[in-house]
Amino acid sequence: MVDSLNLRLALTSAAMLGFRHGLDYDHIAAISDISSIQSKASDAMRYGLLYVGGHATTVAVLGAAAIAFRISLPPASDRWAERLVGITLVVLGVYVLGTFFREAPHNHLRPRTRITLLINGLLWIYWRLGRLFGGTRVEAPQVFKDGYGTGSTFLVGIIHGLGAETPTQLLLFLMAVNLGGTAAGLLGLLTFIAGLLLMNTLMCASAAGLFSATLGRPFALRTLTLLTSAYSIVVGTVFLLGSAGKLPSLTG
């Protein structure tokens, strides 16, 4: 009876931890970036959920390996994963900032993928520096102007999921294993992912609705785009410096 009660408490804690984990700084920045460059709320929601799905996939694979085989990523992986996330956020933030200076930031024929955004962001920086130092090219170079596929959005979610394996999270899963076996540990993992998906889905819906509501209000849209870019660049820089752990908790 005691073990059964403790198991239920462990599963509930895993679900709550997943819900809280969904409200991390990098999730807010990434989902906001995705929403800010889409022309329709449905596209913002779809691409946001692709990112969320990639993140959840990484959590599922790493969590299952830890539970079933007691395998986890080496401690050093946290450092390079944190910096990799920082790079994606800084480059995407700079790209979103570029849309702030364009007359029609949402005039895409098709939503652009995350890798397309990363490449075009770097090309835009290169073009802008060239213009400052005497370059004559009028139009910024771009690749895949109309966007191709959705796999890159999913891939960036996978990258961002590499930093999700926390000691507290693993301790809960292993506690569930001790109380109810491997099956209970996997159930704890599923409840964690369910909490994560719930929070991130709410975030995607909120971001999609917010940006969609500003499409007919140019000043509000440009202000929101500027704030999104600034937030992404600042958070990305913090991650690049390896200081994400010093950020205050958003959930208390």
Where are these regions (language model features)?
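Select subsegments of transmembrane alpha-helices in polytopic membrane proteins
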Residues: 50-60, 154-164, 224-232
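Transmembrane-helix boundary and interhelical-loop signature of multi-pass inner-membrane proteins
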Residues: 63-88, 98-105, 175-186, 190-193, ...
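Divalent metal-coordination and catalytic microenvironments
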Residues: 24-27, 55, 90, 165, ...
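Juxtamembrane transmembrane-helix termini in multi-pass membrane transport proteins
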Residues: 6-75, 170-187, 205, 210-211
